[in-house]
Amino acid sequence: DRSVSRGLGDVYKRQLWESELYIQEFEHKFCNLLRQYLPASSISQRFFETEMKNLHMYGYGLKSIMLSMTETICKVTDGNGNMHLIEEVIGWGQELLQKPVTLLEGVKETISSLHGKYKLVLATKGDLFDQKRKIEASGLREYFHHIEIMSDKKIDDYQRLIDTLGCPPEKLLMIGNSVKSDILPVLELGGYAAHVPYHVTWAYEQHEGEIRHPNFIRLDSIKGILDKL
């Protein structure tokens, strides 16, 4: 659909590097750490409930995850857990906070191809310090006209961003892997949204049902957007 490119001003992107896979591996280790208290599936559920309860206070990111894991330990052990459990969580979390950034396949080539043709904007959510580290380590900063680290990615958050950038919704294309955070809000604002599926998705970001919208683009990989513009 080559009409997507007509008058397109800003192209927004997120999920450029490996992240969710590492976090789910972290959670798997955490659930095994507490297996003497409850089955792993029960620990996972308790942890998710704690995460959801704390989102409005801690926001997104690895530090928020570590705090919710610590609280889950206290709940599951009735406050009698060995300090070694918390030390393990802190150690694993700090390892992830220093983990080298691995770009997803096709990201560098796609961004370099779009650079200079469109204003590229990186819109991501999470811990400010951690996200800034990843952006610098990715080697992609030079390609972006603007970088926005958002506290959340709902309609109002996107509206504030496009108001700041002076880009009307109909000239916006969002490319992302989360239907809930990257696709639906942008479509509702009247922009274009391209979904790049990823094999691992956080339970909070999962979405059921088919998307039917004239501005919705389904891709097999991020490189596929080059054939749509």
Describe the residue ranges of each PLM region.
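Asp-based, Mg2+/Mn2+-dependent phosphohydrolase catalytic module
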Residues: 6, 108, 112, 119, ...
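Basic, amphipathic juxtamembrane/active-site segments
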Residues: 20-35
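Conserved phosphate-coupling serine/threonine residues in phosphotransfer and NTP-handling enzymes
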Residues: 124
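Short acidic, Gly/Ser-rich segments with clustered Asp/Glu that frequently serve as metal-coordination loops
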Residues: 14-16
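A metal-dependent, Asp-based hydrolase signature
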Residues: 42, 46-95
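Single conserved hydrophobic/aromatic residue that forms the stacking wall/gate
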Residues: 1-12
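Long amphipathic N-terminal alpha/beta scaffold segment
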Residues: 88-108
